[in-house]
Amino acid sequence: MKREEHVFNETFSYRYPGKDADHAILIQHGIASHGGIYDSFCAHHASHGVDVWSMDAPGHGRSVNMRPPGRFSIEEWVDDAVALGEHIGETTGLPVFIKGSSLGAAAAYCALQASDVFLGAILMGYAIPSSPLVPNPNPFRSEAFEQIDALFGDKLLLSLDRFINFDEDYGYVGASEQKKADPLNTWYYELRAFASFFRYDPVVPLSQNTKPIFYTVGERDTTFGPDVAKMVADATAGPVELYVHPDGMHQLMLSHTVAYSDVVLEWCRRQAK
């Protein structure tokens, strides 16, 4: 499978051009990561007639330009995903879906609501603005946080390898060490970048959604789990489906590539009919 490298505006993205593709999918990676970590899934998925794109979020991977890694906001992330999604739609003429992995599900949902280019969203994460996991109000919307941010600004950093146990998140011992060997991963977020997820209001909250959403979760996901997934799915209006992958871990694209690809493929083609 051929992997192309694209730069659109300031967004770096990989493209896996599937032969005779009948739809496209734009992937949003999770916390600390970049678009290239899903090579195996993307190549396999593209081989089944999908035009697959996997972008680096702003402040991640190679979408850093004149900024340090970890400096971004969810507003920027959503804008970049929408711009690239519209570019994909215009240049390919294909229906476009957006897929969010873990933290990337927040950006994916918000992008889905910010543009009509996306036919639907596959969300493999649940810390989504307007969901029960990201309530309003919350401490990041407080006057106290604004005072702290005004005082310290970009000097306050969140250590991601302390915040997340990647061995548990990825489902195997050694995952954290392996991630640290990849120079494109990001190990610190500016606290204001992380806070932006809790301060953001999507164009349409989950409770008023009208677009197709496919929630997916591993049966043994230690980060969210089926109960959390059901809680968020139940709080979402509109055409929503929830899929629990048997014996699945958190990173379904990485640890259950073939079987999970089949599930995503079937749902997307059903929506595109």
Question: Where on the chain are the PLM-derived regions?
Answer:
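Conserved hydrolase catalytic core segment
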Residues: 99-123, 128-129
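Flexible "cap/lid" loop of the alpha/beta hydrolase fold
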Residues: 121-150
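Conserved alpha/beta-hydrolase "acid-adjacent" motif
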Residues: 222-228
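Catalytic histidine-centered segment of alpha/beta-hydrolase-like enzymes
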Residues: 248-261
